[in-house]
Structures are given as C-alpha cells and as structure tokens.
C-alpha cells in the first residue's frame, strides 16, 4: 500500500495533494487515471486524447468537486508529443490558509491499449479511504524511462534512479527489449544499437553526471552507486542486442 505524503521535491502541503487525488476519483476521469508517481503527482490518463486546449477542461471538471478551494491551471508546458503519448507539465495555483501554493502535475495521455497493468491500493489518510488504482506494467515503465534517458528528455538523477528501481522490481526481463522496440516503433523512431551504446558510454564517462549523482545520493541518503545504474543500462543494451544476461 502506498501512502500519500510530502515528497522532498514537493513544496506544498500534502493535504492539497489529497484534495486533488480525491477530486480525481470523484470526477468522470477517475477510472481513466493511472498513477505513475504518487509522491510527485505524475499520472497517465488513458483512452482520452489530451492537448493544450482541453487540459483546462479536464481539470475544471476535476476541481469542481472542491468549491471551497480554488485550483487554477496557470501554465501548460508540452514536454513530449507523438502518436504514442503526449506529456505535459501543468502548474496549478491555489490559496490555502492564506498562502499561495504552486502544484506541479505531470500528465501523460496514452492510447486505450497502453498501459495495461496490475491493481494496487492507495490510502488517503485525510478521507480514510482506500482506492484501487492501476499501475503501468513494469516493462513499459522501464522502456519509457530508458527512452527518455537515451533521447535526453528530462534527463536527471531522478530519472536514473527511477530506471534503477523499476529494473530492481522486474523478475522477468524477457519482455523488456520488446517493450522498448514497440516504443521506438510507435514513435516512428529508429532503434539504432550503435547509438544506444554511444549514449550509454557518454553517460558513463560524463564527469558532471557522475559528480551530480554522488551529491544527489548523499543528500537523499540513497545507497546506490553511479556504476550500479550503468549496469542497468548495460543490461538493457545487451537485451536489445539479443544477448543473454546472467543475473
């Protein structure tokens, strides 16, 4: 069970997150939302074509369930866009107990057939409720994270950490390469093994990346070395080449 609480990257009261998530469940989009990252309010909305024009409409419907608190979408930034998925970073402004707060929400619109996942349980402490949600399949999450790292989309330490954690949760990796291939194909992108290898080597040898990771893990008290993450990238590279990985 996941508990919704404040993240080190979230600079607003945790109760506002609970208000938003509870509103989503009460709205007509409740059955379509799939949470990718509860701590940082990253979510998929499946079977619904989102764009910069109708995002306001979606959140207006969601936020109407809390009339005593005003949530206003003030900024919509497109991060990633193709026929497979559309990813936006949304900034929501609200006033709570006399203070103004900005809540970043990452919203990804995907087709009906993605993602297909398993059920999990979310506990909303404020409302004493348990809700069933769906999670993206681990192979698809790993593929999507790997793709963003290879393409330099939002490349940062959190993305590398996410890759490492997802890989650690995978018991069977036989479908990883297929998921990555499907992602590239759906984006009409060429999966060039040589380019993958070069990109991994670039990440491995980049002194700034390594130094930033060391500071990041020290600050967050994370016992994962940079070379551990590189091993995950190497494993994926071998899988894409069609090799066999001994674990």
Locate each region found by the language model:
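Structured mid-to-C-terminal alpha-helical surface segments
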Residues: 2-33, 41, 48, 52-247
């Amino acid at each position: 069970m996941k508990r919704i609480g404040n993240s080190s990257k979230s600079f607003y009261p945790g109760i506002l997150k609970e208000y938003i998530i509870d509103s989503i469940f009460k709205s007509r989009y409740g059955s379509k939302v799939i949470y990718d990252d509860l701590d940082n309010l990253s979510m998929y909305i499946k079977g619904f074509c989102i764009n910069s024009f109708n995002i306001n409409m979606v959140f207006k419907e969601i936020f109407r369930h809390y009339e005593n608190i005003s949530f206003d979408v003030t900024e919509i930034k497109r991060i990633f866009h193709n026929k497979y998925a559309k990813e936006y970073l949304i900034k929501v402004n609200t006033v709570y107990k006399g203070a103004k707060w900005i809540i970043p929400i990452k919203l990804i619109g995907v087709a009906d057939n993605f993602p297909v996942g398993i059920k999990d349980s979310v506990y909303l402490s404020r409302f004493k409720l348990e809700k069933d949600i769906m999670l993206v399949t681990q192979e698809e999450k790993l593929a999507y994270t790997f793709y963003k790292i290879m393409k330099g989309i939002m490349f940062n330490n959190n993305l590398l950490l996410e890759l490492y954690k997802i890989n650690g949760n995978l018991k069977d990796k036989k479908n990883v390469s297929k998921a990555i291939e499907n992602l590239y194909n759906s984006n009409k992108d060429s999966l060039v093994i040589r380019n993958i290898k070069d990109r991994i080597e670039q990440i491995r040898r980049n002194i700034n990346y390594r130094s930033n990771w060391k500071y990041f893990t020290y600050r967050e008290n994370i016992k994962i070395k940079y070379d551990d993450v590189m091993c995950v990238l190497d494993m994926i590279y071998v899988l894409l080449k069609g090799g066999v990985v001994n674990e």
